[in-house]
Amino acid sequence: MMTPVFRVESAPLKTNRRQFLAQTAATTAALVSGCGGLRDPASSARVMTVRGLIPASELGITLPHEHVMLDFIGAEKAERSRYKRNEVFEAVLPYLENFRDFGGQTLVECTPAYIGRDVELLRKLSEASRLNLITNTGYYGAAGNKFLPRHAFRETADELAFHWLADWTGGIEETDIRPGFIKIGVDAGPLSEIHCKLVRAAARTHQRSGLVIAAHSGDGAAAMDELAVLSEEGIEKSAFIWVHAQNEKDVDLHLRAAEQGAWVEFDHVCSLTVDGHVTLVKRMKEHRLLHRVLISHDGRRVQANLRGNTPAVSVPHLHAGHCATRRPR
């Protein structure tokens, strides 16, 4: 029985670009899946990937927040016929192979339902690239609820949790592929009624599955509201990842979240943002909170760009130190 956590192990922080990016590549994040409220020793911790459970020790270098593909058409129009799975496979596989060639072993795929999540495609890519890919359950309410299915508005938090737990126990979309975490999205705080409901549903799913909650949070106020809801639900903050925390300008909120035990994720790392990310990470280190930090790129392939066969933002080349848009050699 175990509670899922990201474990971040890192050497002393370096401040120039090359060293910082090397540090990022060396960061190992372990997403431990299971159920209950007790952590297993690291030797027995396991992670749910699209190909099944693996020991956490096999994660290796991990990108904790990336996307293979996104479709921004909205929940009402989202359907598989909008893209050809084999074309996406051929376009994305070289980037995953490049990540593997430079030492990467695991990619946490954060695309939720109704925005382009395709778990069978992910399993095919995982098998071909020999990478561990981790998918999710949950709903994304950010962007003004555009990506929420109709039933999310009328159902209770418990009813939403029932759907997400069905993914965990029985598999996603009539497959045997199970989620390794919960992904939700909320707009800037204060939380709306429906976004509060999403957080409660995630908390109740976590209570019964142990899956960690990764929350796209519109700002720091939203993240603080989410943490308050988790407190009301009796959830340990170590089960919560504040996604896109770098967008919050009040850096004291980063400290407040981390001091409560939450994970603070600085993503969108690329050549244009690395200096600012260095500053954020240094501050967390100065406050002895580096162990609560996650770093990723939030790379993605946008479905609308598929015909051009060039990702809008690729899964980045870790060695290059920037968000590459060129194809791998």
In which residue ranges do the predicted regions lie?
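Alpha-helical scaffold segments that flank or form the walls of functional sites
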Residues: 60-64, 74-132, 157-177
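Active-site gating/metal-coordination segments in enzymes
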Residues: 124-127, 132-212, 263, 268-271
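Short acidic/histidine-rich active-site segments
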Residues: 214, 267-269, 290-310
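Histidine/acidic-residue-rich catalytic or RNA/ligand-binding cores of hydrolases
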Residues: 72-76, 119, 145, 222-229, ...
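N-terminal export leaders
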Residues: 16-32
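Divalent metal-coordination and catalytic microenvironments
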Residues: 65, 107, 206, 264, ...
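C-terminal segment of N-terminal export signals and the immediately downstream linker at the start
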Residues: 34-57
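N-terminal secretory signal peptides
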Residues: 1-16
